[in-house]
C-alpha cells in the first residue's frame, strides 16, 4: 500500500505534523494512528477467518481457477504454451529452437559448400614463368558510339 512512499515523504509529513499539531501532541497522534492501523488489520484477518470457516469449500472451488490464472501470468510465454498444450513436455518446442537449428547443417549451407568446392576445382593455375595474363578492360571510350559523355538529347 505504501510502497511508493519514500523516506523523504515520511520526513516531510513528520515536519508538517510538528508545525501544525505541535511537538506535545504529535507522539500521541502517531500512537493513535498506529493503533488504528493494527485494529483495522486485526478486523480484516478476523473477517477472512470467519469467511473461510463459513464458506471454505465454496471458496476453494473459486480459488482453483484463480490460482491457475496466477500461475500462467507468472510464466513466460514458452512455458505457458508448453504447459497448456503439451502437458509440460517441452521437447516439442525445443525442436524449434533457433540456436539448435542454426548449429546444425542446413540445405543452404550444404549448397554453399558444394559451390565452394566446384569453384576451387575450376581454378586456373598460373604459368610457371611468372608472366600473368592481364584482363582486358572494357572502357566505354573504346566503343563506336562514344560521344564524350554529353548528348544533344540531354540538352534539348
UniProtKB/Swiss-Prot annotation:
It is a single-pass membrane protein. The keyword DNA repair does not apply. Its main location: membrane. GO terms for molecular function: protein transmembrane transporter activity. GO terms for cellular component: TAT protein transport complex. GO terms for biological process: protein transport by the Tat complex. The Tat system comprises two distinct complexes: a TatABC complex, containing multiple copies of TatA, TatB and TatC subunits, and a separate TatA complex, containing only TatA subunits. Substrates initially bind to the TatABC complex, which probably triggers association of the separate TatA complex to form the active translocon. This is Sec-independent protein translocase protein TatB.
Amino acid at each position: 500500500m505504501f510502497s511508493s512512499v519514500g523516506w523523504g515523504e515520511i520526513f516531510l509529513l513528520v515536519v508538517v505534523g510538528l508545525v501544525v499539531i505541535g511537538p506535545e501532541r504529535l507522539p500521541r497522534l502517531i500512537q493513535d494512528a498506529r493503533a488504528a492501523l493494527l485494529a483495522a488489520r486485526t478486523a480484516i484477518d478476523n473477517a477472512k477467518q470467519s469467511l473461510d470457516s463459513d464458506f471454505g469449500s465454496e471458496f476453494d472451488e473459486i480459488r482453483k481457477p484463480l490460482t491457475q490464472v496466477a500461475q500462467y501470468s507468472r510464466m513466460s510465454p514458452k512455458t505457458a504454451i508448453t504447459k497448456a498444450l503439451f502437458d509440460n513436455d517441452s521437447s516439442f518446442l525445443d525442436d524449434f529452437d533457433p540456436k539448435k537449428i542454426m548449429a546444425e547443417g542446413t540445405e543452404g549451407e550444404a549448397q554453399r559448400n558444394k559451390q565452394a568446392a566446384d569453384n576451387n576445382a575450376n581454378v586456373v593455375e598460373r604459368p610457371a614463368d611468372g608472366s600473368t595474363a592481364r584482363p582486358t578492360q572494357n572502357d566505354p571510350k573504346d566503343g563506336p558510339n562514344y560521344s564524350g559523355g554529353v548528348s544533344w538529347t540531354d540538352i534539348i
